[in-house]
Amino acid sequence: MDYKTKKNSNATVDIKLTFEASDIEKAFDKTYEEKQKNVKIPGFRPGKAPLNMVKRHLGDSVASDAINTLIVDGMTSILSKLEHPMIRFPKFEIQDYQPGKNLIATAIYETNPEITLGKYKKIKIKLPEVSVSDLDVSEEVEKVRKNLARKQLKEEGQAAVAGDIIDMEYTVCEKGQESKNSGNTSNDYHLGHENNLKGFDENLYGMKSGEKKDFVHTFPEDYSQNEVAGKTFEYSVTIKALYANILPAVDDDLASEFDGSESLNVLKDKIRKNLKEGFEDRVKNKKLDEIYKEIIDDSKYVFPESYLREESEHVFHNMIHEFKLPHMTMEKYANMVQKDLKEVQESFQKLAETRLKHYFTRQKIAEIENISYSEQDFDADLEKLASSYQISLSDLKKELEKGKLMEQYRENFFAKKIDNILFDLVEKKYTDKLNIGQIKDYLNQKEEVKA
């Protein structure tokens, strides 16, 4: 067999296979031998007829199978020799076939994506330095106090104030409408909590245990739940129990109760360290997004059509799963959102292309920088994760294997290793020192990557 290839510009390769008479004869013989096991010929038990009789009996009826064997065996023999590796077996077309003489078959196969990276080592970035203030630490200590708070039943006759906890029964209906429920119960309702409905708790302040109160409340026009936005509701509330929320003192006992720290200062040092490391990671991730964007903008990518098609389907089905939509085709989804199918396909292909660019950029950097990820690396990362969950490494592995998540975690850890090395390679210039509040504002801003 002889073969010729020609590389195309779209991550495909033209291939031409030319088989001689001896190649064809071998393929037919191999096919006859396979058929011999099951062929039925009068006078012989199944599979026992002589091969020459099987050949006469089957004749050219095995031509299709023989040609398929010819091509598959031929391709298998040259796979390791191909200059441009094949990522999947293509469909061949027979261009010329003269039985007993020669056969010519052609195909177009897809090869690996082609990535030409920009100069990622010359990227310059500006980033703030995380500076944890005493106030930042104090706010975290206050959260610890709230987590360890205990409730204490208030004395009879005492009124509800912000910070108290109440158990209540209530009925509610839209103003002018008849109530559709006999009553609701809400226990451990924290008065004045930042997540409570704005303006609602003011109606409850001053109430006492056992007291009943009727009032109306109007939801804001821009309320997140459209079915109640801008509407007025009538409430009838009865306080069943009223508690004071007792916060522990800020002392060594607080530290010991929270995580076993030997003193308040030790706890504060832990908080400061965790805040600094946590927000430094968040700043790094923000900058990595910008770094990858610049690398991608400065790089060239050629993806096989099958990669884009399959990744588009993957992105689409992930979206369906994430939003808990019923299983459907992209065409049905386009009808549901009242958009042209081509527009929907292009939008998902764009997302797919972005994902592929990120993935292969990371892989290309790993290849150039000779970054590997060993089984020892994986165990070390899993050990850290297990420690953070306060479970054993073996228990964590069991859970990951149970959920079929082992390879996903391996890939994520490897990606993080590549990201860390990339971050070390770029030129960094630290600007202002920002406290945690300022860092949070910074993280919500969009920023150009270049210095």
From Swiss-Prot:
Subcellular location, principal: cytoplasm
Example GO BP: protein transport
TM annotation in the entry: none
Catalytic activity: [protein]-peptidylproline (omega=180) = [protein]-peptidylproline (omega=0)
Keyword field: Cell cycle, Cell division, Chaperone, Cytoplasm, Isomerase, Rotamase
GO cellular component: cytoplasm
Protein's organism: Leptospira interrogans serogroup Icterohaemorrhagiae serovar Lai (strain 56601)
Gene3D superfamilies: 3.10.50.40, Trigger factor ribosome-binding domain (3.30.70.1050), Trigger factor, C-terminal domain (1.10.3120.10)
Pfam families: FKBP_C, Trigger_C, Trigger_N
Name listed for the protein in its UniProt record: Trigger factor
GO molecular function: peptidyl-prolyl cis-trans isomerase activity; protein folding chaperone; ribosome binding
Entry's EC annotation: 5.2.1.8
